[in-house]
Amino acid sequence: MATQPTGSLRYGFFLNPKARILFDTWIGVRPDDILLSPSGGMEDEFVAHLKKYLFFRTKASIASLTGAFRSLTLVGREAPAYATPLFSSDPAEDGLRILAGGGFAFLHPHQFAFEREAGPWIDLWIPRETFEKTLQDLERRVLSAGGTILSPEAMETYRLECGIPLSPFELNEGHFPAEAGLDAVAVSYNKGCYVGQEPVTRLKFQGQLSRKLTGLRSKSPKIQETACPRPLYSALDGSEAGTLTSLADSPAAGGVIGLGYVKRAHWEPGTALIDGTGQSYEVSDFPFVSPD
């Protein structure tokens, strides 16, 4: 990140020595520090991991800002219009925006994922003392314009509709970055030595994937069982085909959709799979729904 300009926002992985995913994080560059925002509610584990390496950089320090802020997320085509009035006017800002009233925003470039456009996705980090007023103002503006306030369950459905992997469901120590389709944006192949560099580079230039993240459409009208992960099998011969990682009922997509890691022999769109409960699926491309 030393070469990135102030105001830039990047996405990256922290890997284990075998190049499996430990954490994924958004990285924002400010004039005097760097913001790190791990996904999946894993802040404590992430901070502990970073502190293990502090002795290599004695001039660095780590501090948690979580207690000073509360967050909310804007998604959809109109999200930038709702967020822009909150920004400062610094022209140097890019994906990281400073809020005029304190706090900051991450403008996620989710279109990088799988080279598909996932639509605007903006995380706002607002000082706790002004959060309730800011939230009320935003909700009023969104509702008056015909927008919707999404519950946590609805946000999860939206994530799956866009085909966005999330820690710890799709992004965890069981998978390589390339299996999630994110190695091109979250891993450097020309940076100096880092944990996991050798095996992740070897996979890139010498190996081939044995499984990858795919979309899944259920042939059942309703979710019979929501617990994940669960194994997937070929509907033809019962052979092991992969793992279902996330599942949701999406009226916009026309039924039950999910994400999962599927083996090479079964990952072609249209391939029929079943899980251990007898629920049937069909491998599908994503996003399931065109972004608004």
Where are these regions (language model features)?
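Intrinsically disordered, low-complexity, positively charged segments
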Residues: 1-9
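Glycine-rich, small/acidic residue-mixed loop/short-helix segments
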Residues: 7-8, 17, 21, 25, ...
